[in-house]
């Protein structure tokens, strides 16, 4: 199953058998922090799969871990490897919880305590504003975002890499291709003309090149892939994962 980059970081807790990622199966990595990915990943699930995902706003992860987000880029790091006892304890509590509901309650309580413990970044409001602008406007440029945030482009890039894990330019491209994937998920025919126009790609060739870089397949191939997921009655969960 093809999982698109989304522009935000997440936690994964495997209360069943972990899935394999890009053909690699690591049974030890049952609780992890997933950094920002620059291209799609292929995952394979087992029958006893039981995963709790925790998705974060793009600017939120450093507020909880205290670790610069760019260090997680293209990585899926075990909570055991962070060297932070609180995360190691969280892992044990979540995996040993008597129910998913209890596990989720442990996670929520942990996040609240971490947020109360750590200082917020002085640029938090600007980060929130820029992330919101990126979500709303496919046509936004780096210069426009920096101007609206009252920052230089260099400042914005530095703050983004530290707190989001991507450059603002890469975030723009990631979100645009994610929106393209959502539109394709709802299509009934392979007509990508409207998609190209609505999302601000210069032409079909530009859209094809960008989409293939992030999705690992062409728009047409992705359309077929989504229909295969639909035939296996997994489309509801797939669409929910991608927001």
Q: Predicted regions: what is each one?
A:
Residues 121-125, 133-134, 160, 164-184, ...:
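Alpha-helical DNA-contacting segments of helix-turn-helix folds
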Residues 1-128, 133-137, 141-143, 149-153, ...:
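Alpha-helical bundle regulatory/interaction domains
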Residues 143-172, 196-218:
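Basic/polar phosphate-binding segments, predominantly the helix-turn-helix DNA-binding elements
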């Amino acid at each position: 199953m093809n999982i698109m980059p989304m522009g935000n970081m997440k936690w994964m807790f495997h209360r069943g058998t972990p899935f394999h990622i890009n053909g690699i199966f690591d049974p030890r990595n049952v609780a992890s922090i997933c950094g920002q990915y620059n291209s799609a990943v292929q995952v394979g699930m087992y029958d006893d799969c039981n995963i709790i995902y925790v998705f974060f706003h793009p600017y939120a992860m450093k507020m909880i871990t205290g670790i610069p987000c760019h260090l997680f880029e293209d990585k899926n790091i075990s909570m055991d490897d962070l060297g932070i006892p609180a995360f190691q304890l969280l892992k044990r509590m979540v995996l040993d919880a008597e129910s998913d509901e209890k596990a989720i309650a442990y996670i929520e309580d942990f996040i609240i305590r971490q947020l109360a413990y750590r200082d917020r970044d002085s640029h938090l409001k600007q980060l929130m504003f820029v992330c919101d602008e990126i979500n709303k406007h496919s046509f936004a440029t780096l210069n426009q975002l920096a101007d609206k945030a009252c920052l230089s482009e260099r400042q914005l890039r530095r703050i983004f890499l530290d707190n989001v894990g991507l450059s603002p330019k890469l975030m723009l491209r990631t979100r645009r291709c994610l929106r393209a994937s959502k539109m394709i998920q709802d299509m009934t025919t392979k007509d990508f003309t409207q998609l190209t126009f609505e999302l601000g790609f210069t032409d079909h060739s530009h859209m094809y090149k960008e989409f293939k870089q992030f999705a690992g397949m062409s728009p047409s191939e992705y359309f077929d892939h989504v229909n295969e997921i639909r035939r296996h009655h997994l489309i509801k969960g797939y669409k929910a994962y991608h927001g």
